[in-house]
Amino acid sequence: MRIKEHLKQLKPYQPGKPIEAVKSEYGLDKVVKLASNENPYGCSEAAKEALHHEIQQLALYPDGYSAALRTRLSKHLNVSETSLIFGNGSDEIIQIICRAFLNNKTNTITAAPTFPQYKHNAVIEGAEVREIALRPDGSHDLDAMLEAIDEQTQVVWICSPNNPTGTYTSEGELLAFLERVPSRVLVVLDEAYYEYVTAEDYPETVPLLSKYSNLMILRTFSKAYGLAALRVGYGIADENLIRQIEPAREPFNTSRLGQAAAIAALDDQAFIASCVEQNNAGLQQYYDFAKTHGLKCYPSQTNFVLIDFKRPADELFQALLEKGYIVRSGNALGFPTSLRITIGTKEQNEEILAILAEIL
């Protein structure tokens, strides 16, 4: 048996240790996970109620077209129903795009470091991946990304806000880029953390779709909406583009539970507003800590922060793990002396920052 040669350069995704495993290994009664940018406040009570009803239908396949969710989301976004595509998390939309556009005669352009699934899925399809270094402030260098485009370029990925830095692409920068990028090149704007954004110069991206038919926006219910376990993501784009990539989507790819919970979550925007308010207060806790200790902290438009501790990240990761706090070492993210920490509740933030102060 022979697998694709280019698959040999990839490694399977390595998730962090489960909470129960950490408890057992270190003899801990309490473990707090601040590694995967999950919502520390859970999800809307309305979503939980929707799950109680839908769980009675587990013997039935889900609606493969996600019709009810499609209708509700199209109204929320003020877009046509046919301009939406749904995935098993926005990760699957990334996979669909790569399946539809990339092969061994094409290339794709990403920032670096950024969300790794763009590169991972492109490599699976045999495409060349051109990685453009982030600017010193942690944001995308769109001018350099534009210069990297050639006749074989199919897709350009913009992660905004960017994971793992939390930085964003401003309205002016994005518009200037879209005006200059060839119309034959698909621009994918990954807005997984969109709901957390508060920057005044962040672009209203959905209205741009009417002008730029080569733009696609990705969003998810996994972050602010707190439905990570149910895996519901979506893409928004020109109807013709959606129609062309739909054949690459697997049937029944979002569950009955996920669709029902997502609909209910959309109807509870008060929950989102509350989460964003508390997240902003939590971000300030980390900014104050970094300033007090003279550490670089990237200004974030997300529910996580990236802090440079000026020492090996894996050592800090292990020290926190032994204290019952799971974070993400920057060593695997392209920042070997930094930690990426999910913003928790006020109490969780206070506790982990106190531990970090002791370690420093």
UniProtKB/Swiss-Prot annotation:
- Enumerate the GO terms in the molecular function aspect: histidinol-phosphate transaminase activity; pyridoxal phosphate binding
N6-(pyridoxal phosphate)lysine occurs at which residues? Answer: 223
Cofactor(s) needed for function: pyridoxal 5'-phosphate
Which Enzyme Commission number(s) are on file for it? 2.6.1.9
| Record family assignment | Belongs to the class-II pyridoxal-phosphate-dependent aminotransferase family. Histidinol-phosphate aminotransferase subfamily.
Q: Which domain of life is it from?
A: Bacteria
One matching Pfam family, short form?
Aminotran_1_2
Binding partners and assembly:
Homodimer.
Protein keywords? Amino-acid biosynthesis, Aminotransferase, Histidine biosynthesis, Pyridoxal phosphate, Transferase
Pathway the protein acts in: Amino-acid biosynthesis; L-histidine biosynthesis; L-histidine from 5-phospho-alpha-D-ribose 1-diphosphate: step 7/9
Write down the chemical reaction(s) this protein catalyses.
L-histidinol phosphate + 2-oxoglutarate = 3-(imidazol-4-yl)-2-oxopropyl phosphate + L-glutamate
Native organism: Bacillus subtilis subsp. natto
Protein name (record):
Histidinol-phosphate aminotransferase
Alphabetically, which GO biological process terms does the record hold?
A: L-histidine biosynthetic process
Q: SUPFAM superfamilies, from UniProt?
A: PLP-dependent transferases (SSF53383)
